[in-house]
Each structure stands twice: as structure tokens, then as C-alpha cells.
Design a protein with these regions (language model features):
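Aromatic, loop-rich ligand-recognition surfaces of beta-strand-rich domains
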Residues: 647-655, 664-720, 725-806
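Short beta-strand-plus-loop segments that form exposed binding edges in beta-rich domains
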Residues: 488-493, 615-621, 688-695
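Aromatic-lined substrate-binding rim segments of carbohydrate-active enzymes
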Residues: 83-148, 221, 225
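Active-site neighborhood of glycoside hydrolase catalytic domains
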Residues: 174-245
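N-terminal carbohydrate-binding accessory modules
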Residues: 45-97
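Catalytic-core region of carbohydrate-active enzymes that cleave or remodel glycosidic bonds
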Residues: 260-354, 358
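Aromatic- and acidic-residue-enriched segments that line the glycan-binding/catalytic groove
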Residues: 112-118, 142-166, 217, 221, ...
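Aromatic-lined ligand-binding clefts that engage carbohydrates, nucleic acids, or primary amines
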Residues: 441-457, 560-583, 590-591, 613-616
Length: 806
């Protein structure tokens, strides 16, 4: 016999005759011990605890200065199969952190039913970032904005008619607490001190743009802590103009701003209040988002790179929003208000990494910069290869299921109700009634209100299309006999994701009236049909074979075959308005008006062989066919509405008008408030800019408020621009309505070759008692447009604009 002493007190005894077995055992044992050693060391490397904290003028990681260079990505806007590719792209760009929102409404689509699996697995996303050596900043809301449906809040909150969102409303806060606990279960174990990679967690989101309510923000902070986020710094973000409104003493304060901003000016007030705090721009906007019916947005690469250089040279941390925007798949796009404007499905954002994950000029310019700010001894990894791209030959649709021939179960209601009251979150809703009496020609059908795009039918004949974006809530009727079937089909285009308008119920929100002269009659007794956008609802319709393209709302079905898969862009340019599903995946919205004409189709959702595609077109296509392109089309507008707010031949006449107030603005950034000596009543508010601060012709305004009798800003919900003497639309969307779009980084700007004076007339929608106004100049550094001298005119009736050319 032979005794082999393998480990201190562990003996294996083998009979010599079995030496071959022994040798085999030793070989396997060696392999096992080697793999165990490697695995143990790998696991230890992945779970090593660290400490992240705020130090004097810098963040500290394990006691050493650390500059956060974060890339904002959204797991919801990237197919799960591509998560790691996009994270690797960010690392190759020079980032050390990934910043993410948590989208409440995608995890709790039905009250009480949470989903953190698959595409929604936020813990897996964070672990993927850690796998590639990236830290994570978590922004759990509950409100996130992000150009996302209702700012991330679940639609079913609106079933409670008196709910006050983003306040201490008891039901709202109860649901926020439940949601935060679920997020904590997923992510609190991944805090950096526990061996994970989460280094910071945000409390609420840009609340200063919503209101002043420190008790509410404090309550959200407490819920975040109670959910388990107690071991990493908590922070709150806002704009430099309003961050003090709700600033809590025990949170880190950060500010958000865009490319071209004056860095020193943005942090000036924060440094005065907290001279030793680490500075961070928690959203440095690399580009901007697109709206249906408006030009594709871009921002100069050089301005973005220069802004980041300015921050790094000052030891300021940043998160680049967006580093990769991706795609708002399905129905999840949000909207702005006022004026209502829905977001496109593409969230390309003109970011350094394109919608499809490609490198851009911005990517390489920024990568070249960030190479200079690496820790000693580090180099950037190679840029990952782009994913395969394919073309798909044109294929046609011959199977059609008319929507009116595929009605779901009917529901009855005496009075009009929005879709939430029928337990519907998204999609379209059909309201049907019969006219109780003959309707005379010229009678007005008034809908209060259309949310968001409606088609009106009488006995199946299309009478009108009404668009909330344009304030279209009425139509003139022809003669209609008693008993005529009146159908109003309303599509929900995306709930508002910013400001108080997030209480955005869909369908018809209040009532429908017939108005003739001074008489009005509210229509009652409605039959309602709900059309959600779930694949389970739309997949099994009664399709007919036809080569005739209908002009009525319909579902279309086809298949296409592939020899190989890859990313592509579905060309929807011959279609009207609706949504697309491929192999059960909701791809997004299309609308002929543009600017987006293609839908990004990830190759990971395609398959070799036969693929199924379904299209819902509420308007009807010109040609029912689709092909896959190798490049997107994001900048083709077909909107026929005028871009600017001055009709041909108009020229504002002010010579005989009474000046309500005159003065001069002080130079520099930041809000300026002006109070009038006396109260003035009026509906039409005119600002005339008389001279610039610098030697240029340009006038520019970022935001504008009119102060009411209580000294507070009046509602801008229904404001319209009646007149602007000049608006720059060649280099960007610089139209006058930007002064009340609630975004400080967008602005009205006049054309550079049009001299002063410049005039702007706002229709306040009703007579207001005006006590003054607030004005925010354009925020960018060393850019023109600062106004010096001005005059104010206020009238109850509209101004004289001369003869309009028809």
C-alpha cells in the first residue's frame, strides 16, 4: 500500500494496483483545484467592497479622489441582448460609470404586479456594467421625465380622479413606497460597499421645475433610504436656476444643463452655498429629442466636447445625457405640454453613440478628449465592432383586418369618460352614439378635450381629423339625420412627461357637445370600445385577403423570410399613422408627418426563416409595403403647417398702442423678474425688444412667465404664440413657442440678419390680471441674443398686424 498525504489531515489511500485510477484522479483533482482557485479569485475581484463618498471638493473612492465620468443609458431603450455591447462602447469612449433611470411604469404595468425579468432585469443590467468594470448611478424616481410615457409614472394612478401626483397625496405616496421597496430588493445588495457597483442614488428628479415642496422631497428621500439605499451618497438634481427651491441639507446637490452652457455660471450659486462640495453636472445634454412634426434635433459636437473639457479641467464630475439614446420601443414615448407635442420613437438624441449603436463624430472627438483624463497607467480599450446590418427586400401586405370589423366587447356609459376609467392604459378608444335629433348644417361638434388624435365619422364616413398638437377640438358638421351613428376614434399618443400636465388622461377627457348659435347640447349614452396595444390583443384579428388598400383604420399582416439576421431600419414612409409589431415585439410608432420615417429593427429580435409583422394604421397607407434599409431616415418632414408664427403680409403696428411698461434687462444669465407699478388686465401680451446687450441683431429668450394678481406665474397650459417678427428655423427649432416649453436649454431666437426692434405676442388664452413677468435669457456661453431695452404692451383684444396675404 501507498499513503499519499494530499492536504494536512486529509489522506487518500490507494492500492498500488490501482495506480492508473490514482493518476487519473490526481489529474482531475489538479484541474478542480486550479479552477476553484481561479473562480475564487474572480469572485473576490467582483465582490470586493469599496467606499464611495463626498470629500472636500471631490468625490472619494476608497479615500482617493474620483471624477465621475458617467454615460447615461436606458435599459428599456436597448434590447437586452445588446446591453453589454452598449456598455462596452461607453467604456471604450472613456467613461467609468453608467447612469440609469428606473422606469416605474414598465415594472408595474398593472397595480401590484411587478416585473423585473428579462428586458426589465435591472439587477442583471447593473451586473453587466460591473462585469466590464463600470460603476452605476441609479435614479429610481419615482418620476424620471426622460421623454417617457408620463415621466415613468404608471397610468393606473390616474384612475383615482382626484390624485395629486408628485405630492404627499396619501395614495400616491403609498404606491411610491411599495415601488421603492421593490427596487431596493433588486438593487440595494449591489451597492458598492456590499461588493456591487452602485455608487450613488438620486432622490426624485428635477423637482424644482415642478414645484416647491420640501416635505414631499424629504418623504421621497426617506422612502429611498427605507428601501435599503443607506450605504452610498444620495443626491438630488435640478437646474441652476431653481435647485435651491427644494434643496435638502443632507443630500448632495447637482445641476443639469446642456452643451454650450457657461460652466462657471451654472455652478456659481452652488459654489457660493457649498464651497467645499464636489461639483457634478448630473445631466449634460449631448443633443436633444425629436417631436413629431418638427425638425430633427442636433447639437454641435465641438460644443459638447468643449463643455466636458471645461468641467474636467475644473475637477467637475458629469453624466452625459445621453451617451446612447437608443429607441423608445412600443407605445412608451412621452410628450411635452404646452403646447402638446408627442415624442418620436427614435431616441437617437444626436448622442455620441447612435440609435443603432454606431460610432459618430461626437464619439471619436470625445474619446480623443477623455484619453487625456485617464488614471495613470490606464489606456482605453478598443472600440467594439459594430453589429451586422442587413437590407430586407420590399414585401407587401395582402391580409387586412379593418378595425371597425374587429370591435372588442362593448362597454356602456351615459357620460363620456377617459380611457383610464375603462381600465385601459394605452392605445385607441372608440366612442359611439346616435344623434338624438336632426343636426343642421353648420352645427359645431365640440370635444372637450381630444387626447390626442381623433377621427370623427358619421355613419362610417370620415368627417374630420382633430389634432391636440394644434388645439383642434371642434369641427363643423354637415346636415345629419336623426339616428345617425356618430363615431369618435381617439388615439393616445403618449402622456405628458413634464410639469403639472403629467395628469394627462387619454381619450375624451370631459364631454362632447353640439353647438348651434347660442344653444349647446351635450351628447350622452355612449358605447365604448377599447383597443389596447398589447400583442396578445392585436395578434388574432379576422384578416381578409385583399389587394385594395383601405383608407379606414385597419390591422395589416405579412411575413418575410431571411437567410441571415442583422439590424435594419423598417421604411414606413408610405404608411399613415400607427404602430408596428415584429415577431411579437412592439417596434414603435410611425407617422407620415415625420421627421422620423424609419423604425430601428434590432437583429436580435429577427430570426432566420419566416418572420411575422403586424401593422396598425389608423389613417391608412398610400402603399402597403415595407423594406429594410441599412441607414435610418430621421430628418424628413412632411408637416404642412407653417413653421413660424407670422403670416404672410403681417407686420405688428404699435405706434398707436399704449406702453404698459418699459425698462432694461441686466446683462448675464439667470431669471430676471419685473413688477409693474399698476395692475394691467389683458389677454394679449407683447414684448418688444428695442436693443441688444451686445453688438448684434439677435434677440433670444429661453423661458418666459407672466405674473398674475397673486404675484405667481399664471398657467401656461393653453398659451399660444400669436406673432413673432422673426424666428430662426434654418439652424434649429428656434421658434417662439420655445419660451413656454418648460425647457431652459431651448429658446426663441431671431434670424441674424433681421435688425432690432423685435416683437413677440403671446395669446394667454383668456384675460388675466397681470402684475409683471419673469424672463430667462439664453444660457449658452458667448452666444448672442441678450436683450437690453424693452417695452411691454398688454391688451384685451388682439393687436393690429396689417393686411394679411391670403
Amino acid at each position: 500500500m501507498i499513503e499519499l498525504n494530499i492536504t494536512g489531515n486529509f489522506k487518500i489511500v490507494y492500492v498500488f494496483v490501482y495506480c492508473n485510477i490514482y493518476l487519473a484522479f490526481m489529474k482531475n483533482l489538479f484541474v478542480f483545484l486550479f479552477l476553484f482557485y481561479v473562480s475564487s479569485n474572480y469572485s473576490e475581484a467582483q465582490t470586493t467592497a469599496h467606499k464611495f463618498e463626498a470629500g472636500k471638493n471631490t468625490f472619494l473612492l476608497d479615500g482617493k479622489p474620483f471624477v465621475v465620468k458617467a454615460a447615461e443609458l436606458h435599459y428599456t431603450r436597448i434590447p437586452q441582448a445588446y446591453w453589454e455591447h452598449r456598455i462596452e462602447m461607453c467604456k471604450a469612449l472613456g467613461m467609468n460609470t453608467i447612469c440609469i433611470y428606473i422606469f416605474w411604469n414598465i415594472h408595474e404595468q398593472e397595480e401590484g404586479k411587478f416585473d423585473f425579468s428579462g428586458q426589465n432585469d435591472i439587477a442583471a443590467f447593473c451586473r453587466a456594467a460591473q462585469k466590464h468594470g463600470m460603476y452605476v448611478i441609479v435614479r429610481p424616481g419615482p418620476y424620471v421625465c426622460a421623454e417617457w410615457e408620463m415621466g415613468g409614472l404608471p397610468w393606473w394612478l390616474l384612475k383615482k380622479k382626484d390624485i395629486a401626483l408628485r405630492t404627499l397625496d396619501p395614495y400616491y405616496m403609498e404606491r411610491v413606497g411599495i415601488f421603492m421597496k421593490e427596487v431596493g430588493k433588486q438593487l440595494a445588495p449591489l451597492q458598492v460597499n456590499k461588493g456591487g457597483n452602485i455608487i450613488m442614488v438620486q432622490v426624485e428628479n428635477e423637482y424644482g421645475s415642478y414645484g416647491i415642496d420640501k416635505p414631499y422631497v424629504s418623504a421621497v428621500r426617506d422612502l429611498v433610504r427605507e428601501s435599503g439605499f443607506t450605504d452610498v451618497p444620495l443626491f438630488q438634481c435640478d437646474w441652476s436656476s431653481n435647485f435651491t427651491n427644494n434643496a435638502l441639507d443632507d443630500l448632495i446637490w447637482t445641476v443639469n444643463f446642456g452643451t454650450g452652457a457657461n460652466i462657471d455660471q451654472q455652478f456659481k450659486k452652488l459654489k457660493e452655498l457649498r464651497p467645499e462640495t464636489p461639483l457634478m453636472c448630473s445631466e449634460f445634454w449631448s443633443g436633444w429629442f425629436d417631436h413629431w412634426g418638427r425638425k430633427h434635433e442636433t447639437r454641435p459636437a465641438k460644443d459638447m466636447v468643449q463643455g466636458i473639457k471645461d468641467m474636467l479641467d475644473r475637477n467637475i464630475s458629469f453624466s452625459l445625457y445621453m451617451t446612447h439614446g437608443g429607441t423608445t420601443f412600443g407605445h412608451w414615448g412621452g410628450a411635452n405640454n404646452p403646447a402638446y407635442s408627442a415624442m418620436c420613437s427614435s431616441y437617437d438624441y444626436d448622442a455620441p453613440i447612435s440609435e443603432a449603436g454606431w460610432t459618430t463624430e461626437k464619439f471619436f472627438l470625445l474619446r480623443d478628449l477623455l484619453k487625456n483624463y485617464l488614471p495613470a497607467g490606464e489606456t482605453l480599450p478598443e472600440v467594439p465592432a459594430a453589429l451586422p446590418v442587413i437590407e430586407i427586400p420590399e414585401f407587401h401586405f395582402t391580409k387586412v383586418a379593418p378595425l371597425f370589423s374587429n370591435l372588442p366587447e362593448a362597454k356602456q356609459t351615459v357620460d363620456i369618460q377617459p380611457m383610464e376609467q375603462f381600465n385601459q392604459g394605452w392605445g385607441a378608444i372608440l366612442y359611439r352614439t346616435t344623434l338624438p335629433e336632426v343636426t343642421a348644417a353648420g352645427t359645431t361638434l365640440k370635444i372637450t378635450e381630444v387626447h390626442d388624435w381623433a377621427q370623427v365619422y358619421a355613419d362610417g364616413k370620415l368627417l374630420a381629423r382633430l389634432d391636440r398638437r394644434k388645439g383642434e377640438f371642434t369641427t363643423t358638421l354637415p346636415v345629419l339625420k336623426k339616428g345617425t351613428q356618430l363615431d369618435i376614434l381617439v388615439e393616445a399618443m403618449g402622456r405628458v412627461n413634464f410639469d403639472k400636465s403629467i395628469h394627462d388622461r387619454k381619450g375624451i377627457t370631459e364631454k362632447v357637445e353640439l353647438i348651434s348659435g347660442n344653444q349647446s347640447k351635450e351628447l350622452k349614452n355612449w358605447t365604448v370600445y377599447n383597443f389596447p396595444v398589447d400583442y396578445s390583443f392585436i395578434k388574432d384579428k379576422k384578416y381578409n385577403d385583399t389587394k385594395i388598400v383601405p383608407t379606414m383604420p385597419a390591422y395589416y399582416k405579412s411575413t418575410f423570410n431571411l437567410d441571415k439576421v442583422g439590424d435594419t431600419f423598417l421604411d414606413m414612409s408610405t404608411w399613415g399613422k400607427g404602430m408596428v409589431w415584429v415577431n411579437g415585439h412592439a417596434m414603435g410608432r410611425f407617422w407620415e408627418i415625420g421627421p422620423q420615417q424609419t423604425l430601428f429593427m434590432p437583429g436580435c429580435w429577427l430570426k432566420e426563416g419566416e418572420n411575422e409583422i403586424l401593422v396598425l394604421d389608423l389613417k391608412g397607407p398610400v402603399k402597403a409595403s415595407i423594406k429594410g434599409l441599412k441607414k435610418p431616415i430621421l430628418d424628413v418632414l412632411r408637416e404642412k403647417a407653417p413653421e413660424t408664427h407670422r403670416k404672410d403680409g403681417e407686420k405688428l403696428k404699435l405706434t398707436s398702442e399704449k406702453v404698459g411698461h418699459e425698462g432694461a434687462f441686466t446683462p448675464g444669465n439667470g431669471w430676471q423678474e419685473v413688477r409693474f407699478a399698476t395692475l394691467v388686465k389683458g389677454r394679449y401680451f407683447c414684448l418688444e425688444a428695442l436693443s441688444p446687450q451686445a453688438n448684434d441683431n439677435i434677440a433670444a429668450i429661453a423661458e418666459f412667465d407672466v405674473l398674475g394678481v397673486d404675484g405667481k406665474p399664471v398657467s401656461r397650459e393653453h398659451w399660444k404664440i400669436r406673432y413673432a417678427d422673426s424666428e430662426e428655423t434654418r439652424s434649429g427649432n428656434r421658434t417662439a413657442d420655445k419660451i413656454f416649453d418648460l425647457q431652459e436649454s431651448t429658446f426663441w431666437m431671431t434670424v441674424d440678419n433681421v435688425p432690432y426692434p423685435h416683437q413677440l405676442v403671446i395669446d394667454l388664452s383668456k384675460v388675466e390680471t397681470v402684475t409683471g413677468f419673469r424672463y430667462l435669457p439664453r444660457a449658452e456661453k458667448e452666444y448672442p441674443g441678450m436683450i437690453r431695452e424693452y417695452r411691454i404692451f398688454i391688451k384685451k383684444e388682439d393687436f393690429d398686424y396689417g393686411k394679411v396675404v391670403l
